[in-house]
Swiss-Prot record:
Role noted for this protein: Exhibits esterase activity towards naphthol AS-acetate in vitro.
The protein's name: Esterase PIR7B
One Pfam family from the record: Abhydrolase_6
PROSITE patterns named in the record: LIPASE_SER
Organism, scientific name: Oryza sativa subsp. japonica (Rice)
Family statement drawn from the similarity comment of this UniProt entry: Belongs to the AB hydrolase superfamily.
Induction of synthesis: By infection of leaves with certain strains of P.syringae pv syringae.
Residues at the catalytic site: S86, D218, H246
GO molecular function: methyl indole-3-acetate esterase activity; methyl jasmonate esterase activity; methyl salicylate esterase activity
Gene (UniProt): PIR7B
Keyword Hydrolase in record: yes
Class in the EC hierarchy, top level: hydrolase
């Protein structure tokens, strides 16, 4: 899909739980080849970020790389397209609330998408409610951690879980890469930011155009779960990718890039 020079955007891509900027490598290359700026970030204690999971005490600290990147966007007239995958949708939501004027659109790719008037932990709570116990953790490991907020747990995604729930439609090379690079992740479900029903406002978060990309072959967050989140935020545009597993950027990178470029052309 071609783009005009006037519609080129800066995409900032945010990974999901336990992953890192590395998972966006196909999408970053395609967006840059199309003439866009594309930046994939490591959240704190993720990917190549130097912190350990027990050194990151709050969800805001975890999301700080994104918040700092959005705050620093200083090109004249530059507005960003924020793209969040899975748990990364919650970091994107926080950035939308803080910097709505800097965001042309936010794209939630098989992602947790909160809504105004409810706390940010609601999508995760609903996901757990809908998921049968035997399919929730499989061979994932729960790791005890202690940080500045006290004791808690992080999760390590197991190889069978990755193969059956996240990457079942993706190339074998991408599954192998994920097995080597995933790190323990913290969902921060007890963080005050996750429990504040007044955090997301109509004037900020609600004012930013949202697009939800439904992964129709997602074995983790089912299509029904994804549509439930869309229904909770009326006015959200919807795109669908047939055959996309949870790791949409690996199973259907070309289709995802086409959608992102279409969004860049549509929203100024």
């Amino acid at each position: 899909m071609e783009i005009s020079s006037s519609s080129k955007k800066h995409f900032i891509l945010v990974h999901g739980l336990c992953h890192g900027a590395w998972c966006w490598y196909r999408v970053v290359a395609a967006l840059r080849a199309a003439g866009h700026r594309a930046t994939a970030l490591d959240m704190a204690a993720s990917g190549a970020h130097p912190a350990r999971v027990d050194e990151v005490g709050t969800f805001e600290e975890y999301s700080r790389p994104l918040l700092d990147a959005v705050a620093a966007a200083a090109a004249p007239g530059e507005r960003l397209v924020l793209v969040g995958h899975s748990h990364g949708g919650l970091s994107v939501a926080l950035a939308m609330e803080r910097f709505p004027d800097k965001v042309a659109a936010a794209v939630f790719v098989a992602a947790a998408m909160p809504c105004v008037g409810k706390h940010m932990g609601v999508p995760t709570e609903e996901f757990m409610r809908r998921t049968a116990p035997e399919g929730l953790l499989m061979d994932c490991e729960m790791v005890a951690i202690n940080n500045s907020q006290g004791s808690g747990v992080a999760i390590n995604l197991g190889p069978t879980f990755l193969a059956q729930k996240y990457y079942q439609q993706s190339p074998a090379e991408d599954l192998a890469l994920a097995k080597m690079l995933v790190r323990p992740g913290n969902q921060f479900m007890d963080d005050p930011v996750m429990k504040d029903e007044s955090l997301l406002t109509n004037g900020n978060y609600g004012s930013v155009k949202k697009v939800y990309v439904i992964a129709k072959a997602d074995s983790s967050s089912t299509e029904e779960m994804q549509r439930w989140m869309v229904a909770m935020s009326p006015g959200t545009d919807v795109e669908e990718i047939a055959g996309a597993d949870h790791a949409v950027m690996n199973s259907k990178p070309r289709e995802l890039c086409d959608i992102l470029i279409k969004i860049a052309n549509k929203y100024e």
